[in-house]
Curated annotation (Swiss-Prot):
Protein family per UniProt: Belongs to the G-protein coupled receptor 1 family.
Protein name (record): Putative olfactory receptor 2I1
Location in the cell: Cell membrane
GO-annotated biological processes: detection of chemical stimulus involved in sensory perception of smell
Length: 315
């Protein structure tokens, strides 16, 4: 009896077992993206902490984004790699719940953090003379803390609401992670409409409210850029905000597709490829998007390498 109970408390994650010839390729790509994510985001945090020239609100928020991305990917990639190397993965319910909580918390925190970064850029471009007074270190800490707290709150709320829904057998997930839309597909019918509507409303708030803030912020930036007289300032503003918009489009496009559709319409086979993009690919691209054309970050990297070289020569 105990064995039967423990079997019922596990989820079978099929991952990409329907495409066996694709699994070795995906394994290599996912591992490469994961290494790029850890390396790129760690380097970004190191540079921002060590170089006084990067002690500004923009890089403070970028550090938090780097930490979110590294944690978000780490909550997903290890079981995904295990799944790609072998047969379908059996995951205990406790592990599944922990993964769901972590990915929801970090993904939600990223939604809010991207909105905070958009507000920061709008303040820098639209109010350059008052920027230092508006965006104080205390405000930066408050906004960053609010991003993490919002993510944690949404994660706890969504997980608690999901726990109210009884899940029907077989507990088979055509996915590589315990993602909310895939788990909702297993929920039994009946009295769950109210709970599901509450969960959907929470997802709308955590996704669309920050997205609206982002659109409004970059609308204000666009108006300010059009009024600029100097082409140099216009190019800097467009370059900085353009990189932010690229990251926003990559993340929000796939996240909105995944989370803002009814559970009945959710296609697991298509959904796992979309999820692969925003959980693995986007975190690997973010350090490149934000730093590839950033002269301050490149300068900080050169200074760090020179200091390390002098240290080695001194020994």
């Amino acid at each position: 009896m105990k064995a039967n109970y423990s079997a019922e408390e596990r989820f079978l994650l099929l991952g990409f077992s329907d495409w066996p010839s694709l699994q070795p390729v995906l394994f290599a790509l996912v591992l490469l993206c994961y290494l790029l994510t850890l390396t790129g985001n760690s380097a970004l945090v190191l540079l921002a902490v060590r170089d006084p020239r990067l002690h500004t609100p923009m890089y403070y928020f970028l550090c938090h984004l780097a930490l979110v991305d590294a944690g978000f990917t780490t909550s997903v990639v290890p079981p995904l790699l295990a799944n790609l190397r072998g047969p379908a993965l059996w995951l205990p319910r406790s592990h599944c719940t922990a993964q769901l909580c972590a990915s929801l918390a970090l993904g939600s925190a990223e939604c809010v953090l991207l909105a905070v970064m958009a507000l920061d850029r709008a303040a820098a471009v639209c109010r350059p003379l008052r920027y230092a007074g508006l965006v104080s270190p205390r405000l930066c800490r408050t906004l960053a803390s609010a991003s993490w707290l919002s993510g944690l709150t949404n994660s706890v709320a969504q997980t608690a609401l999901l726990a109210e829904r009884p899940l029907c057998a077989p507990r088979l997930l055509d996915h590589f992670i315990c993602e909310l839309p895939a788990l909702l597909k297993l929920a039994c019918g009946g009295d769950g409409d109210t709970t599901e509507n509450q969960m959907f409303a929470a997802r709308v708030v955590i996704l669309l409210l920050p997205f609206a803030v982002i659109l409004a912020s970059y609308g204000a930036v666009a108006r300010a850029v059009c009024c600029m007289r100097f082409s140099g300032g216009r190019r800097r503003a467009v370059g900085t905000c353009g990189s932010h918009l690229t990251a926003v489009c990559l993340f929000y496009g796939s996240a909105i597709y995944t989370y803002l559709q009814p559970a009945q319409r959710y296609n697991q086979a298509r959904g796992k490829f979309v999820s692969l993009f925003y959980t693995v690919v986007t975190p690997a691209l973010n350090p490149l998007i934000y730093t590839l054309r950033n002269k301050k970050v490149k300068g900080a990297a050169r200074r760090l390498l020179r200091s390390l070289g002098r240290g080695q020569a001194g020994q």
